[in-house]
Every structure is written in structure tokens, then in C-alpha cells.
Regions:
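N-terminal nucleophile
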Residues: 1-244
Length: 244
């Protein structure tokens, strides 16, 4: 499960993600340079199923996945859908592919899509019906949890409001502090989550400007402020065959 926030700064944007998982899950791999359908992108890879929960491509598009409840062994990993959709060159194309993909073998999820200069979009699947929200701004931050999902969402949003009250404008530093926060106390409801059976296992920070995309990744709980791994990718708006 995850907590996801973002900020737009003109055509640029920044995306922040805490990934929460049970201790029984295998650790993810560090971010990699990958290619799918001729599209280059950056993503860490899930250790169990080979998909990803967050990715950014050379068109400047980012996707962040929030699972809505556990899947079953018979279902396709939702992270593999992210790997397929991130090959699209535009947010419109991502929405189009989402609309035509057979989702019957996927458990419920919410997928955030970000593109330079455009409102964030939400693509949702509840296991029966799909939905699209063209402007997800009012929904920020996005929260999913397998334990008390409504309570976690309410408390984490309240935590962000307290952080925002300290500054007249939302800044990247505010969101960085938010994602490392234990307020009001470290536990199941805190943004940096700690439970007996699960915890926040990684923090990812994506930045996209007019020239390149950067993905910074910390394995482990973000409250520890461990040194992370960073990759960059030059943006390309030309036909893919012309991109270096």
C-alpha cells in the first residue's frame, strides 16, 4: 500500500511515494533504466512479481500505483499493468490504453498519472468498473492501507494539512517532511508507517523539468534518512526512433 503526493511548478512537477508492504514480501530491486515498446523509462522492480508501483518515462510521464486491497494468486500483478502503460507517449494515450485493457484479471487499484503542464489524472478499477478523474488535485495526498483504510487516509491528510499550515505555499520541502513523518505517533496511521507485520519499505521521489526526469529511491523506512540511489533520463519529445 502507499501514500502518494505531488506538486506542480509550472510545466515541471515532483512526485513523492511511500511504499508500505508486509515483512513477508521480497525486497524490491533498485531503480533501473528500462525500455518497453521503444519507450525508455526509470523504475524500481517489485521483488515478487517483476512489475513496478512507480515509473517515469522519457516523455516526462509518471505513474504511481496504489493497491486497493490484496490480490489473489490467480490474478495478474497490478505492477505489470504499470509496466505496460508507461510505454505510452502521452497521458491521453495512457487513458486510452486503460480504457481498452481487459482488467478482469486484476485486483482493485488506483493509478495516478502525471504529465508536464497538465493536471494529475486518476485511473481507478474497483474490480467491476473502471473510472477516470481528469483532475486529481483535490484528492492529494492519495492513501491506501490494508488496515483501517479510511482512518489512515483521514489521519494522513490531516497530517499534511498541519504541515501546510506552517507555510503559505506548498513546497517540495513540505512534502519531503510529510513523507518522513510519524505525526502524531509512529504506527499504522502515520505516513512513515510502522506495524508489527508491515512498514514503509521505500521512499521514491520523482522530479521532471523541461530537460530530464530524475528518480531518487531510498530502500527502507524514510524516517531513517538513508542514502538513496538516483537515476536520470533525458526527456525526448521527438519520434522515439530519433531519441538517443
Amino acid at each position: 500500500m502507499c501514500t502518494v503526493s505531488w506538486i506542480h511548478q509550472g510545466p515541471a512537477y515532483q512526485l513523492f511515494c511511500n511504499r508500505d508492504e508486509k515483512h513477508t514480501r521480497r525486497p524490491a530491486s533498485k531503480p533501473q533504466h528500462l525500455t518497453r515498446g521503444g519507450m525508455r523509462f526509470l523504475a524500481p522492480i517489485d521483488g515478487d512479481f517483476g512489475g513496478t508501483w512507480i515509473a517515469v518515462n522519457e516523455s516526462g510521464l509518471s505513474l504511481a500505483l496504489l493497491n486497493r486491497g490484496p490480490g489473489s494468486p490467480a490474478q495478474i500483478s497490478r505492477g505489470l499493468l504499470v509496466m505496460n502503460l508507461i510505454a505510452a507517449p502521452t497521458l491521453t494515450e495512457i487513458m486510452s490504453r486503460f480504457a481498452t485493457t481487459n482488467l478482469s484479471d486484476f485486483a482493485a487499484f488506483t493509478l495516478l498519472g502525471l504529465a508536464p503542464g497538465l493536471p494529475a489524472a486518476l485511473l481507478a478499477w474497483d474490480g467491476r468498473e473502471r473510472g477516470v478523474v481528469a483532475d486529481a488535485g483535490p484528492s492529494m495526498p492519495l492513501v491506501s492501507s490494508s488496515v483501517d483504510p479510511e482512518g489512515c487516509a483521514s489521519r494522513r491528510r490531516a497530517t499534511l494539512e498541519r504541515f501546510r499550515a506552517k507555510s503559505p505555499a506548498l513546497r517540495p520541502g513540505t512534502l519531503l517532511a510529510f513523507h518522513r513523518s510519524h505525526a502524531p505517533v509512529a504506527g499504522a496511521h502515520s505516513v512513515c508507517m510502522h506495524r508489527d507485520d508491515a512498514q514503509t519499505v521505500s521512499f521514491t521521489w520523482v522530479t521532471v523539468d523541461g530537460a530530464e526526469a530524475n528518480l531518487y529511491y531510498e530502500a527502507g523506512s524514510p524516517c531513517r534518512s538513508l542514502a538513496g540511489d538516483s537515476l536520470s533520463l533525458a526527456l525526448c519529445s521527438r519520434p522515439q526512433t530519433q531519441c538517443a
